[in-house]
């Protein structure tokens, strides 16, 4: 069995887990998430914890048990604490403004870029060069952050662009005469 799947997921107080066939519904203080479990994975609820295991002994079933455990653990963390991702805008005149369910980005193009924020995600701009994305779904938060970063990724010569907070960009040396 997968080493990840061997560890049970503890269910904290205030989190409700319901099984509806192969669908696992998790409800907490910040919202609710659901996941469809693969037929070859077995999920059991025992005294405040969820345990995972393969129904058959195939390598794929064992791998899927670990994947399912990681996904459900992220769902439990999401409905209790939530997830956040910070982006930094580096470059002269690069700015961001949160306007309702959209972010207005000025990234050196001839026009401002308006990025629509999907449902279940909130974005705020504490400063003009910082964007904070929050939500309960880890995958969605990361996807939105990656889409914003892809509008103007950091370039390798000056490092200008949108980068994750704490990201190290390798800067190349300019061509010498």
Swiss-Prot record:
Recorded superkingdom: Bacteria
Keywords in alphabetical order: Ribonucleoprotein, Ribosomal protein, RNA-binding, rRNA-binding
UniProt key word Membrane: no
Gene Ontology terms: cellular component: cytosolic large ribosomal subunit
Molecular-function GO term, any one: rRNA binding
One example of a Gene Ontology biological process annotation: cytoplasmic translation
SUPFAM superfamilies from the UniProt entry: Ribosomal protein L6
InterPro entries per the UniProt record, alphabetical: Ribosomal_uL6-like, Ribosomal_uL6-like_a/b-dom_sf, Ribosomal_uL6_a/b-dom, Ribosomal_uL6_bac-type, Ribosomal_uL6_CS
Family designation: Belongs to the universal ribosomal protein uL6 family.
Complexes and interactors: Part of the 50S ribosomal subunit.
HAMAP family: Ribosomal_uL6_B
Function text: This protein binds to the 23S rRNA, and is important in its secondary structure. It is located near the subunit interface in the base of the L7/L12 stalk, and near the tRNA binding site of the peptidyltransferase center.
Designated name of the protein: Large ribosomal subunit protein uL6
Annotated organism of origin: Hahella chejuensis (strain KCTC 2396)
Biological classification of the source: Bacteria, Pseudomonadati, Pseudomonadota, Gammaproteobacteria, Oceanospirillales
């Amino acid at each position: 069995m997968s080493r990840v799947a061997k560890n049970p997921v503890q269910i904290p107080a205030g989190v409700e887990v319901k099984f509806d066939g192969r669908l696992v519904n998790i409800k907490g203080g910040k919202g609710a998430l659901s996941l469809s479990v693969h037929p070859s994975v077995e999920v059991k609820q025992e005294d405040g914890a969820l345990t995972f295991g393969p129904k058959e002994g195939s390598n794929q079933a064992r791998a899927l048990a670990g994947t399912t455990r990681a996904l459900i653990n992220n769902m439990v963390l999401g409905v209790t604490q939530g997830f956040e991702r910070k982006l930094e805008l580096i470059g002269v005149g690069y700015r961001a403004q949160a306007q309702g369910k959209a972010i207005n980005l000025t990234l050196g193009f001839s026009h401002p870029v308006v990025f629509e924020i999907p449902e279940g995600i909130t974005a705020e701009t504490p400063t003009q060069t910082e964007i904070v994305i929050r939500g309960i779904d880890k995958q969605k938060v990361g996807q939105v952050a990656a889409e914003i970063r892809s509008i103007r990724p950091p370039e390798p010569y000056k490092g200008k662009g949108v980068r994750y907070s704490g990201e190290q960009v390798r800067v190349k040396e300019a061509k010498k005469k």
